[in-house]
Amino acid sequence: MDDTQIEHPRPIPIFYCCYLLRSTVRHASLYIGSTPNPARRLIQHNGVVKGGARRTAAEKLRPWEMVLVVEGFMSRLAALQFEWAWQNPWYSRHLRSEESSALAEVKHRRMRKAKSEDPEFLDSNCDSAKSRVKGTPKKSKRRHRPPRSLDTYFSDLHRLLRSTYFSHWPLKIRFFSGDIYQSWKAWYDRVDVRLRSPVKVILDGSCPEISAHTGGNDTRFGGVENAKITYAAIRDYIEKAIFLLDDPKDVRCHVCQGQIVPTEELTTVCPQAECHCTCHLLCLSRKFVDAALEPNQIVPKHGICPACEATIEWPLMMKELSFRSRAKQELLEILKRKRRVDRKQGAVTGEVESSSRRTVSVDLDDRFGQHAEDEFLLDEDWWEGLAAESDSDTDLRLKPLSKAAPKLETVIEDSECDDADIL
């Protein structure tokens, strides 16, 4: 990791997901991957543009369809962790059953007891280990993956979302295929253990629209191609935060009632359109964690706004805050434009706010509109400079705030953790 990545961290990605592909020709053929841009990734898998995966390159299985996604990952690294665990449930520590853990503990206790009762036990084991080393080394073989049915994928996904590690993440399941959702529902109704309440199910695409499954920011995209993957999705929220914090004279924390200095302190802003609540980051997080009554919780998931009393999601606030605190150049340009208009029209007080809002809105449109993915918002190489590549859209290399790179993308080989069941 170079120094520039440490000094200039990127904003939290507005969208990152793990997806499940299904062949429209052979429904038993399934594939797992991760991406910040599901629409582009799907056309890559279908061979429309270069950059697809070897395991989805067979023409006899194309076209592929994206039937569901697990969204809500706060980084590329987090999505890769979930992707690998879903691809390799036999080796993932997150999916080890309690029975296996108990057997391992019993074996460990027996080993310790044998060592304490027999002093020569350790020497004999060392000798046997040395004899094995002297023998002919075994050739490494590719790990065999047993065939997995759709129900097996559901089971592994269900176990992952209930695991100690992933159950505290703000993850959601979004179905794009109606028959896949019906299969999930039929499978889920037979399971005794329910998913924890934070995990939401969103019906999208060809699924029937049921309002009970959606709410807040969990809106329907209408299809994979309409996924909201840029900061344009929260443009109004960013606008409001900029206006509230631009003049910090009367900005106070609604938790501690202390003065806020936005240029020196991390400040949160309520995402509700009509609420002007501002808080110190630590004050609000402490309030949310205390209200959750979960002793092991460090990062809050959601909470009640101290001003408007609406339930607000912590990840959404952190995305806006990360953009405001890390995309310095974009914010400076927006504020300079706003203040220039304020000075020109300062005499007409009734026109100042509306003109400024229109100007900022246009500027945000330029920054977050249809060309946003050609700047830095969808640069897939920014997170932690990972050397280990996955199927997860590692083939596009774009630099922040530069001219759009050519759309020709290199073909990448699947990593050893890529997964597809071709039956």
UniProtKB/Swiss-Prot annotation:
Its EC number is 3.1.-.-. Residues 14-96 form the GIY-YIG domain. GO terms for biological process: double-strand break repair via homologous recombination. Its cofactor is a divalent metal cation. A zinc finger (SLX1-type) spans 253-308. Residues 114-147 are annotated as: Disordered. Catalytic subunit of the slx1-slx4 structure-specific endonuclease that resolves DNA secondary structures generated during DNA repair and recombination. Has endonuclease activity towards branched DNA substrates, introducing single-strand cuts in duplex DNA close to junctions with ss-DNA. GO terms for molecular function: 5'-flap endonuclease activity; crossover junction DNA endonuclease activity; zinc ion binding. Keywords: DNA damage, DNA recombination, DNA repair, Endonuclease, Hydrolase, Metal-binding, Nuclease, Nucleus, Zinc, Zinc-finger. GO terms for cellular component: Slx1-Slx4 complex. SUPFAM superfamilies: GIY-YIG endonuclease (SSF82771). Signal peptide: none annotated. It is an enzyme of class 3 (hydrolase). Residues 131-147 have a biased composition (Basic residues). It is found in: Nucleus. Forms a heterodimer with slx4. It comes from Aspergillus fumigatus (strain ATCC MYA-4609 / CBS 101355 / FGSC A1100 / Af293). Belongs to the SLX1 family. This is Structure-specific endonuclease subunit slx1.
